[in-house]
Amino acid sequence: MALLDLQAMDTPAEDSFGELATGSQVSLLVCEYSSLSVVLCTP
């Protein structure tokens, strides 16, 4: 997680779309594998 956050901080503004895509992937992983998925991923 920390490594992903550092990479996002170093990402130029023009790559913000890629940053959002990475965030979505991380969110999916959290939803699939975390016990907090009920709290974080309710529509």
From Swiss-Prot:
There is a cross-link at residues 24-31, 34-41 (Lanthionine (Ser-Cys)). The keyword Signal applies. The modification 2,3-didehydroalanine (Ser) is found at residues 27, 37. Residues 1-21 form the signal peptide. Maturation involves the enzymatic conversion of Ser into dehydrated AA and the formation of thioether bonds with cysteine. This is followed by membrane translocation and cleavage of the modified precursor. Keywords: Signal, Thioether bond. Lanthionine-containing peptide devoid of antibiotic properties, involved in the formation of aerial mycelium. Suggested to self-assemble at air-water interfaces, thus providing a film of surfactant through which nascent aerial hyphae can emerge. The aerial hyphae differentiate further into spores. Belongs to the lanthionine-containing morphogen protein family. NCBIfam families: lanthi_III_b, SapB_AmfS_lanti. This is Lanthionine-containing peptide SapB. It comes from Streptomyces griseus subsp. griseus (strain JCM 4626 / CBS 651.72 / NBRC 13350 / KCC S-0626 / ISP 5235). The lineage of its organism: Bacteria, Bacillati, Actinomycetota, Actinomycetes, Kitasatosporales.
